[in-house]
């Protein structure tokens, strides 16, 4: 995630002029990358057919690119933190783009709505090279980035305590398969709408180009909420780590839990003042391997020690007793408990939010499916192996996160220290991105603030960081229930990006694309779009072209939406129930780990 966001984080405002480009040699194109993040993708005057036209042109060019040494072998450059050099081999056949005059003479558009045409300043050649320079990632690198962003199996054993062996394995497999299918849907839409001229830079761009601004706003709001509550969850988890660390090997009285949350929050907004993320590259790679070590360590320790009965009783009110496992759903649990366990699977596969950003940096986005399938399979196997090992050894006493449920204090300390390091890095990255998303969608679009790279923008960023972290702390201290809170985040936000939005976007994409009949489409010579009808009739005609596929996606969408509603209800109900019967209270000194 850190790697994929580095370019956006460091982008500066372009200083472009006709004179500068008039003297520039065509072999030395120096266009700053921030121009690729401009609002050309949100121009309401650009039609769906125009996006399709230039996307087909870009895909045809990408077929000519060599793939030698661009697969799994490219992982070495990612692991070492080295940025691959962009290779732009030749220039595709020039396309006659609509001129400013042609757009101005187009009576189908209102003069007041005509956008400022930056393409009149930047030549097609320069635009092509500037766009290609930002695309260097390979499918091997994408496999690594998806894996490191999603891989985090520490809630899987607790999910098995709520589901049992059979339902747990089955549901994790189903959600892995459907997450892969959703990724393929997003990949297909990206190929059809992304181009060097109109690059797709994020999930919201797909929503805008298919359904309009209202859908983009929904996506941006949910993305902002996901990043914010991601920081909140990390504050709770690492507050628990600090609480366990403060107890010492003899189990003495721990620090006040709310104080532990404050300590991590203060550390977070101090480190979070780093505005750019390039410096996080090596640190983020180190944190990945620390995470892998904690996974292996936890599996080894649970096989040779007792569970942490004190922590389990403090959080779940399960008294010490014989270890039990269940082939099916445990008989002493309710449907609400099963749904909360299911939401851990949703949370575990929450990587679709970043798929568009990864494809936007790929040299050949067509190859994305390779990295997706390999990563999805690898992550599923890791989750199942880790979940089965820990659940088989600890049974109903499996804790969330799992490394806090091991009993030897020395190894528990190792897990907590490494967890603090990786958690602080992850929280700072999520906070950094979350603030930038808010600034772009509220500060820039609504309040008309200057660019983040400006002096005012930097001051606003610095002032926003403590407010952002302070708000996350308030929620963390008010709801210190990591399992129920993660279930809520999974149901309300992550499930939408991984399962609800992809099929509904696919239906819209198919309808708009298949509605284009003979003699219709975009004319690059005039900039006009020829359509013989508009409105509902056009959508119905497009839907019928792929009736079975579209109908399946509608059913998939309705199923995902229903699951989201059930998950939100179950998580909120469980929060209320735990407050009524557990020792965990808001803003309390009592720790969920005992």
PLM regions: where:
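Membrane-interface helix caps and helix-loop-helix hairpins in membrane proteins
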Residues: 274-282, 484-485
